[in-house]
Amino acid sequence: QDWAIEDGALVCLQAGNKKPLRTAHWITRSIDTAGGSVDLSVDIAPADRGSAAPPSAFAGFLIGTGGEHVDYRLSALAHHLPAPDGGLLAVVDGDGVVALRRFDQTFAGKAIWSVNTEVALDNLPLLEGQTRAGDGFQDNRTRRCQLKLHIEGTIVAIKAIGVHGDVISTAVATVDDANLLDGAVAMVSSSGPDAAKGRGFAFSHLRGSGEGLLHHPDRAYGPVLCTLYTVDQEVLKLTAQFGPMGEGHAASLDLKNRDGWHQVATSSIEPDSDTATFRVNGIKTLIDTPFRVRFREPDATVESTYEG
């Protein structure tokens, strides 16, 4: 896996030179600049506190992959290598300097997103005509920042804000080709402090607003991906498959009758398989009997449900 949740942050586990540009797609959001302005922001830091990434490493947003003409699930596979309709990178490097880079131009005849090859910054050309300012981080001990992206018509602007609230780097450009902007929204982490064995960047406090940022609640997927069940000799056995969860999680199973929903079982989530297995005795019939699996992150106020 490329990603994990740690202390409320999304952490990229990969920093190797042959696994660059790891992406985590916000599949319930997309950009349509014809609808209005877009604002995105996220806090970024090296995944391992106290470490410093080189200027060849970067993190931030990948926007504009695909669009309404492409299935969003296909766009969500975009990572690693640039390709036609790949979109635009709005990123901050290990020195705290921001840049707008193209992710739609192939190099060396390669146009496959999931291959094992190195990608240099020269393979991700700077967007033409952009104006950049700022020297980035001034303190090697504090390599954290907030990255803000603003789109207004054809104008794209990004800035990195340091831990003391000061703007440490900016970039702005005019983008005449809407295909670079319209489409998917993703976070991207490429390389990191230690390309041999380290991790990439950590993201937290992701926010988005603006009439040009579209919301697609029907695209939400998880944390329960699917369920399988059997009923034999009045025993219900149901397995719920989760996405990657880590350790220390549990889920509940409810059945519904004429009186409403009733919890009938609980199960820990097995960290190796990311499955919760439920067993319920005394099941007379399961014909037209709704069930749901409930899950809540520790200390979370919102509960996720999967119904069948």
Question: Across the structure, where does each feature detected by a protein language model lie?
Answer:
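Extracellular glycan-recognition surfaces and repeat-rich motifs
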Residues: 1-14
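Beta-strand-rich interaction surfaces with strong enrichment in secreted/lumenal proteins
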Residues: 25-32, 131-138, 175, 226-227, ...
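Extracellular Ig-like/FN3 beta-sandwich strand-entry sites
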Residues: 35-37, 142-144, 235, 248, ...
